[in-house]
Amino acid sequence: HEEWMACHQDFDYSTLDNMQCWGGLDLGSTRDLTCLTLLFNVDGKFVFIPYIFIPEENAKKRSARDGVDYVAWLRDGHIFGTPGDVADYSFIRKKINDLSKKYRIQSICYDRWNASQLVIDLQNDGATLDPFGQGFVSMSMPTKTLEAEILSKNIIHNNNPCMNWC
């Protein structure tokens, strides 16, 4: 955790506008968070921007269950609330399409286990999506690479408390 925290830097995120980036999407439903993380390569450093979503109606209950304050994170803009008590994929789709206008998203990898209509809709919207399994075979090398980049301080993140907790 301290190695990750050491990668926080003050960074002018507006300089990323219209830059090329790649995304990773993990779809939650009722018990999990949904997260889109965008990754930018800026002068050899990897800049992460997380967009984390939780159903608004169960944020308080989930705060008690998970021992973190989702309600405060919603209030402070660190995570986004979707309408209802399950993940609202139409809300998430709109956010991804809005981000596609701000950044040049090259592709979004997603967990094929929880693939849904959202993936089809985003592809119909013009997004490039690539399935990515979350098993040992597919996750081992990327996880080792991420760990090495964190230890080398080649990562920049915005100190999002939810991302730090995850």
Regions found by a protein language model. Give the residues of each.
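Short, surface-exposed amphipathic charged segments that create phosphate/polyanion-binding patches used
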Residues: T143-S152
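RNase H-like, metal-dependent nuclease domains and their acidic two-metal-ion catalytic environment used
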Residues: H1-Q134, S140, K144, H157-C166
